[in-house]
Amino acid sequence: KAIDNLKLIKLQEDSISENTCLHLGHAYLRLDDLEKAKLAYATAIRYNIDPKLREEAMYNYVQATYLHNSALGESVTAFQDFIQEYPNSQYINKVYTLMADMYLTSKNYQAALDALLTIPTPDDKMQETMQYLRYQLAVDAFVQGKMTDVIKWANLVIENAAQPSTYKTEAYYLAAQAHYRLHQYPQTIAQLQLYLEQSNIAESTNKTMALYLHAYALFNQ
């Protein structure tokens, strides 16, 4: 009903039309008609008459683009346009969070982490996500055989851990594996000792392998 009523308004180059398109977008968004929501918000943005309405329309366009699972390039452009135009917006942290989630879904962990690192005061959930991303970057580096990068990312996980956590514990183990492959046996032993000292070590599935690795490192040093 709201959509039918809004459609009756003749669109012109004025603030009433801009507001109409914004609310059409809201109505379509509630109906999960994301393509029509995007078009309505895009029209409101194009009018560019009321600065506050434009900001709200751009933010909601970002949301609709994200929810629509649009092509990565289109989504990135929407995020970047908003961030560039409204760096101090009340919506900016939410935009960065959505941007990070988009990159996370596409497994672009570095870009996701970069997006979250721009948030001045990340909450606990964001901090946890950043730890996950650092750990995944360490794992990816390990798979690619980039042991120096493994150590770098594992150390960042450890340094940014406010308390014992799975990521911190496993980062010690991953760093030990990287040091071992670099034939750095004293560092391997040191990382494994820290790994084994963690309060949640009983939850780790790598404990048995760590003990073997510890013995091999002692033998080789």
Segments (PLM) and residue ranges:
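Acidic, polar-rich low-complexity tracts and alpha-helical solenoid repeat scaffolds
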Residues: K1-Q221
